[in-house]
């Protein structure tokens, strides 16, 4: 008899939809961001350096189909029969003219072995005409729209120059879910000014939204960002968790989350040459093992402290 899982894991979620192994391939489709080009603001979010999540095969000068083929070769040596999700990750992947967006998504879906899309975007970049198109696309392929939520506190969103309020996130998530589209969120735990109590309250706020999946990761200070300069000038404004502190925070956070939300990850690993701090020297699976060990010690599980 198998043990009850401590939390809902993303691989188990994918098994509900696919009878084979599935791997996401990150893409850089040449998008920018309304928080960089002046539409919403300039300079971007203070923590952001998109180099931190662009693999070597993922370059804007390469066509989407070529990025996917190179990504497939990167993964195929391990699982030759694997299928793939095209992950539009870098910048804001719904920011553009509708016909241009459709061409990009459909170019990805035309690649052999690609069985669906994951589209990362901002909650203030989901116009009605695009949402109608995605609603129809969702009838023919796997589709997950992943919103960068980052925080539920408007004070924090202003501080990191996010360019939208939490209510904008609420509206986007609810509109997307109402179209029958799987809807995910991404948050950063430990943004400046946020306490342990604030962060746990965030879990409660997110649990009220119709989210299917959630990614979280620790605040990382990245070279070349405005936040790195802020840290250099005022380090007292930041609390950078040590690994044990962050494990305990994640456990508390997960206990307050709605039990059915699928948890995709707890940490992120930025390239060594870009990372200022914290540097724990752990792989994702090593951190996950620490979380699972701590949850077992505390008899914790996802949703244990969840209140509707």
Provide a role label for each language-model segment.
Residues 75-77, 104-112, 132-142, 174-178:
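Acidic (Asp/Glu)-rich catalytic clusters
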Residues 1-85:
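N-terminal [4Fe-4S]-dependent radical SAM core
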